Amino acid sequence: MRKGFPAFEWWADPPQEVLVRMYVFNVTNYDEFMNGSQTKIHLQEVGPYIFREKIEHKDIRLNENGTLTYTTKRRAVFEPDLNTLSLNASLNVPNLALLGMTSYLSGASFFVKFAFNLVVRKMDMQPLVKISVYDYLWNNSNSLLTFASKMVPNMIPVDNLGVLHMIYRTYEDEVTVFIGPNNTKRFFTMDMYNGKNRFGYWSNMTCDSVKLATEGVLYHQEVSKEDKLHFFRKNLCRVTPLYFANETVNLGMSTYRYVLPLDTFHRPKDGSHDCYTLPGDKPHPDGLSEISPCFYDFPMVASLPHFLAVDPAVRNQVDGMQPDEEKHSGYVTIEPNTGLPLESKAGMQCNLVVKNVDGYSPVKSFSNTYIPIFWLQLHQVGIPQYLVSMMYFVVVVLPNVQGVVSALLVVLGTSLLAIGVFRFQRKATKAVYSYISLDTVPSSI
């Protein structure tokens, strides 16, 4: 991995091959739920809205200890040519500011709840609101959020709850990875993240360590079927494991497919402490993973899309979930010699955590529920053709050429040896005949 080589140049200025497919959930029974005739909200998936994730690597420097330090920045750009849906369409969605703040204050004193209820009534805040798709993704604010961010900035550090805005607002981090020849199995795994050997999300080092984590742009060389890969995505707030599933053929090359286990977000089976749980909180049901430290402490959990592999009791809190393992699970296809991912898909759903909010009359019907907000799919659709050609030559053509050349050299060597032996025998035979002819010449004495 050196400057000037194709692999380095491709990584330093990566082609924009990652598509972000956004799916949002529209509440279709707004009136029935609000008047109490129906007890569960019905959600309809709307999407995809397709963006291209632009990745920039800057401030790149090679370190003397065999590591590489760089700053990675990501942003999402709307792709008009790939979209058939309008960002101006209207949605009925949960009022994230109201529900999130009441959930945050669920354990507050009576006086705090009373004061908050007065503010909510004065502002005529409703638990469900109508909003455009664009504003829901990028510019989701209201008078309650603006008021709270000014009055208690430590509790409400943002004044915009647009879901993509929250994901990409601070997506710029310094990463140090191993690249030296002595770090083959740790190639492009993290050594430091923002100058530390931990992410800073969790108190337990087991969950917070950067060791073996990778951003998924490159994996180590000579990947084996026994290897467990470690994928880190900032908005997931944790490292997730990938395990070998099967061999495949991709772009004419033999590849390995690694998958994300469906029980990744389950609680430990041995009953040990779940270090992805916030202090003072109870563990979430199986299939849910705490991500609020990565969303400004906003009460959020991640799951697989449509509550795939989530505790059925959680899925039954809302109507409209249609989990599909083939559509909603994640994988990465890797060329094992180089560790280069040729294709990958990863799906993640963000869900609002509403705790016991019985003390807040406008939202008490949402108490103790997990409300799906959106799910997104990250899809690396391939790699540039010049890189495909180079890889194909290295992993397919060159080994075969080497085999043919080796065989030709063996044949040539054997032929030369045979010719040499033949010539030697021929000379030896001529010499014997010469001596015999001398013996038959009559003596002149």
What are these regions (language model features)?
Residues 1-254, 260-445:
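Extracellular or lumenal secretory-pathway regions
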